[in-house]
């Protein structure tokens, strides 16, 4: 069966949808859900703020009706969230390793996970991650549809519309909380890309799958032409749509170009349709982008997409540091959070080089958490009380209090223990010449008439 719901009577479609309750449809009716209450509590904001923001679509709460998780809010006025990706490749298929990586990401403060496997039994690994994760879990359904098409038919371009929609439906039923949907890779955006040209072309895996399908089949992307059916499937399970940026630049040489902006215009239109249908939605943003263009990108996205939550991938702010791209991304994360981005996908030291191992995942989460924190500190989302407590503990040379104030206390403790000082109130960097100790002993205690 080929789905072509654009031909359905929209009145009938609206009747189908109207009985299904989602976070956004509840909020529009003034209904405060338990998930909204929880988000308000952990974010230290009013329930009324959350209710109104979810109703407007400026905050989303990924929480599939088929899973019981700790709800997390993403959007304006909330702490910037960090996503960690896990998943097999065609070269390395180790389900236990992926579950271990997911647990490491959770332990080090990731707010959400995405399961992006393309090797092995994709249903099994997805369900294992869903079963173990107390966090929202996202996916990219076109991966499964494409990989299974290759296995069954020999090619991505032989994928059917049913393959695409069946993958979305299956993953929604499994409990996936948010999905990257590549609806904006269409004839219009591909035409714009071809006319313009690029250094690195398309680097989105899902975008490359769909662009190949469109060109070979000489048909419009079903995820665009039948977007109403995507909305119906998402609404049934209250899945947040993360409208994917298949046209994102793969190098800073291609950043903020016409193809990217063309896609953003289409995404803005899809946001309006999603909200009208009662489906929560956010927008994915650039991957490779220089620092000076980050505020511009956030501003354009917020205006074109009616202030929908913005999900930045990294971003990578220079292209010449493979092996250290988690540091590059932390810089991008801080700049993005400061500019108003709402959700950051981590980058690991293995980016552009290999499938991340558990240590890579740990380093990626830590770096991105620090970047997001720094951005939130600059905007005032974080009030700085933890930083003040750390400053006061350092002034007192109170090492235990410093560990308690640290984002990652085990790392701080381990580093000091590796090279212990002769005197407990100092460290081996300065020893007896510690500036804080000197000031504490002489300047602060001085009763000199000269310095009052």
Regions found by a protein language model. Give the residues of each.
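Catalytic or ion-coupling anion/metal-binding cores of large enzyme and transporter domains
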Residues: 191-218, 249-255, 355-452
């Amino acid at each position: 069966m080929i789905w072509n719901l654009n031909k359905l009577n929209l009145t009938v479609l609206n009747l189908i949808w109207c009985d299904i309750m989602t976070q956004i449809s509840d909020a529009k009716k003034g209904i405060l859900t338990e998930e909204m209450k929880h988000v308000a509590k952990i974010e230290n904001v009013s329930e009324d703020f959350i209710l109104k923001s979810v109703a407007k679509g400026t905050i989303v709460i990924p929480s599939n009706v088929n899973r019981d998780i700790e709800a997390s809010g993403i959007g304006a006025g909330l702490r910037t969230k960090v996503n960690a990706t896990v998943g097999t490749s065609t070269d390395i298929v180790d389900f236990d390793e992926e579950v271990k990586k997911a647990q490491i990401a959770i332990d080090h403060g990731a707010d959400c996970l995405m399961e992006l496997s393309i090797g092995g039994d994709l249903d099994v690994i997805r369900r294992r991650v869903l079963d173990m994760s107390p966090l929202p879990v996202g996916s990219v359904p076109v991966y499964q549809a494409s990989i299974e098409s290759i296995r069954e038919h020999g090619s991505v371009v032989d994928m059917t519309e049913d393959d695409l929609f069946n993958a979305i439906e299956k993953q929604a039923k499994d409990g996936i909380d948010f999905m990257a949907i590549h609806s904006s890779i269409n004839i219009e955006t591909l035409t714009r890309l071809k006319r313009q040209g690029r250094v690195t072309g398309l680097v989105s895996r899902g975008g490359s799958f769909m662009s190949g399908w469109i060109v070979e089949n000489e048909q419009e992307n079903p995820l665009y032409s039948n977007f109403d059916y995507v909305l119906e499937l998402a609404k049934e399970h209250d899945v947040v749509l993360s409208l994917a940026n298949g046209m994102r630049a793969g190098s800073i040489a291609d950043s903020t170009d016409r193809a990217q902006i063309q896609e953003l215009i289409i995404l803005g239109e899809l946001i309006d349709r999603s909200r009208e249908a009662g489906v929560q939605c956010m927008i994915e943003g650039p991957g490779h982008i220089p620092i000076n263009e980050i505020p511009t990108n956030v501003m354009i996205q917020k205006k074109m997409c009616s202030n929908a939550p913005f999900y930045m991938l990294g971003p990578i702010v220079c292209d010449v540091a493979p092996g250290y791209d988690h540091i590059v991304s932390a810089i991008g994360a801080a700049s993005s959070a400061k500019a108003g981005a709402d959700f950051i996908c981590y980058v690991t030291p293995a980016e552009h080089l290999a499938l991340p191992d558990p240590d890579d995942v740990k380093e990626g989460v830590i770096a991105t958490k620090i970047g997001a924190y720094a951005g939130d500190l600059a905007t005032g989302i974080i009030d700085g009380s933890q930083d003040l407590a750390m400053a006061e503990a350092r002034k007192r040379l109170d090492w235990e209090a410093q560990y308690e104030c640290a984002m990652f206390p085990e790392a701080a403790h381990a580093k000091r223990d590796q090279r212990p000082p002769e005197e407990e109130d100092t460290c081996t960097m300065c020893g007896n010449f510690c500036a804080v100790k000197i000031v504490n002993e002489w300047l602060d205690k001085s009763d000199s008439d000269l310095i009052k």
